[in-house]
Regions:
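Soluble periplasmic/extracytoplasmic beta-strand elements of cell-envelope proteins
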Residues: 88, 118, 147-149, 186
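N-terminal catalytic cores of peptidoglycan-degrading enzymes
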Residues: 2-138
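Substrate-binding clefts and substrate-entry loops adjacent to catalytic sites
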Residues: 132-134, 147-159
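Short, small-residue-rich loop/turn micro-motifs
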Residues: 93, 150, 189
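Basic/polar, cationic surfaces and motifs that engage anionic cell-wall
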Residues: 25-26, 30, 46-62, 66, ...
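Solvent-exposed, acidic/flexible segments
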Residues: 82, 110, 141, 156-164
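Short loop/turn motifs at secondary-structure junctions
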Residues: 83, 144, 179-181
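Short coil-to-beta-strand
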Residues: 139-147
Length: 221
């Protein structure tokens, strides 16, 4: 049986369909190549992306700070800070305890909490964690904050004069060192609603006075 002979029009249409299929195939191949290339570039850039520089001018504290870094463990994990967006003020919640008492507690192998600094009853300041590492004090804000625990003589959580003055000085330095302002200083309470630091939560005006003192101290930098 002889085959069916195509008309010239049908031959023309068949050629056009074949050319269209070739163009579509070429387009798909080019598109796939572009996608693979884009993915490859993204992966390369991600792998070679420089880590964000921590916004701290120096990791070295002032001379009045006693550096007594706690050992790495549950409390000090060694995880690096992403950046510094706030300074968080806490109170130790253990009336009459000293800065050294609290630092040594942080250093126990089974302790899973710590702060960067502890301000003591005599105005002494101890650094427990490096400024480029996260502490374990401010819940979901540990990765972008510096934490300061503050000692207090009585249950009301009010800081004595020596402690208060050192806290103002340290907080102002931390702000200046990290490019922050007094408004960037917050309470643990502002993160979780916890009554910490107690006196500054119970007395909002005292908290505002503290921020004003930090702002005034910043003028010295």
């Amino acid at each position: 049986m002889s085959g069916i002979e195509l008309t010239n029009y049908e031959k023309l249409m068949l050629k056009r369909r074949k050319r269209r299929k070739k163009r579509i195939k070429s387009f798909v191949i080019i598109l796939l190549v572009l996608i693979v290339t884009a993915v490859g570039i993204f992966v390369y850039l991600s792998a070679n992306k420089k880590p964000k520089k921590l916004n701290a001018e120096t990791l070295d504290p002032p001379d009045y700070v006693s550096v007594q870094l706690i050992d790495k463990g549950k409390a000090r994990t060694g995880v690096k800070l992403i950046e510094i967006n706030n300074i968080v003020i806490h109170y130790v919640g253990n009336p009459g305890s000293t800065a050294q008492n609290n630092r040594d507690y942080f250093n126990k192998h089974d302790t899973d909490v710590c702060s960067h600094f502890v301000v003591g009853l005599d105005g002494e300041v101890i650094q427990c964690v490096p400024l480029d590492e996260k502490s374990a004090a401010s819940n979901n804000r540990n990765l972008d904050t510096i934490s300061v625990e503050v000692c207090h003589p009585y249950d009301d959580g009010k800081f004595n004069e020596a402690t208060y003055n050192s806290l103002v000085t340290l907080t102002a330095w931390l702000c200046d060192n990290s490019g922050l302002k007094a408004k960037d200083v917050i309470r643990h309470y502002d993160i979780t609603g916890k009554e910490c630091p107690k006196y500054f939560v119970d007395n909002e005006s005292a908290w505002e006075e503290f921020l004003a003192a930090v702002k005034a101290e910043l003028k010295n930098y």
